[in-house]
């Protein structure tokens, strides 16, 4: 699988990257909230979704050690918005809904000699009443409404 990668399992589209884009967005954004912003990390994820790019910072910051080869910049774009977007970061672990996607930062699986955290994702089947009432033109399959994400410690 490439990095970043977009793939589908049973009609659910996943997007994932190993690059810590959330911390880079956090350190390079120009935004000041009047009060403490409890949804700051989800707001950063929203930038990824709005720009439809796994790396929405161009050009990369001068102090960035991200291994970005600009010849492959097109591969950072996603044509279909992922239902579940996994953006691992050293920042606090989080999970939340951004538009019609679920954004997850499972943090790091290993932290030095101690265990870290991971995301346990459960997606329930689409209820029969939603299947029967759906039209051919309807493309929404309600993934955020039928998904539970638990961030667990090892």
PLM region descriptions:
Residues 1-154:
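Extended recognition/assembly regions associated with phosphoester-bond processing machinery
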